[in-house]
Amino acid sequence: MKKKVLFICVQNSARSHIAAALLNSECGEYFEAHSAGLEPGVLNPLAVEALQDLGIDISGNKTQSVFDVWKSARHIFAYVITMCSESEAEGCPIFAGVTTRLHWSFPDPAKFTGSHEERLKHTRSVVDRIHAKIDSFCEEHCATVP
């Protein structure tokens, strides 16, 4: 059975979608990744574009509240990974059954300024950094998945 992972960022607009898509792509035989936000916003088109460069399409993804995920109790998560600032992460609900809670800090693409090309370049950099973290996570945890 696949272990479930929930990635959380503030608006569920970029970082958490990027991480969930990359984990499902890289290690989907072991994990089922989901994403949510503290205050769901709109899916960031730069995140969509940056992942399309890797052949991953998240254009149909919807944003959702971590509190709605928590209240629905549809999933028992083995890992909850926050991707916002530590102080923002403290506002996340406690999920029953969570084996491990991790915090990965990455810049928010919604806060990038400049031209479209400059913001896309910075977003691609965030995607690369998240991708490296996902690769490390898979190397570390795939060996422990039954």
Predicted features along the sequence, with ranges:
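Conserved active-site segments centered on acidic
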Residues: 1-71
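Mid-chain, well-packed structural core segment of small domains
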Residues: 73-97
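Phosphate-binding/catalytic loops
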Residues: 88-146
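Alpha-helix boundary/capping detector
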Residues: 49, 77-78, 127
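Alpha-helix termini
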Residues: 71-74, 145
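Residues at the C-termini of beta-strands that transition into short coil/loop
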Residues: 37, 84, 105-107
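Generic alpha-helical secondary structure signal
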Residues: 45, 64, 75, 117, ...
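Hydrophobic/aromatic beta-strand patches that form the interior of the parallel beta-sheet core
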Residues: 34, 79-81, 102-104
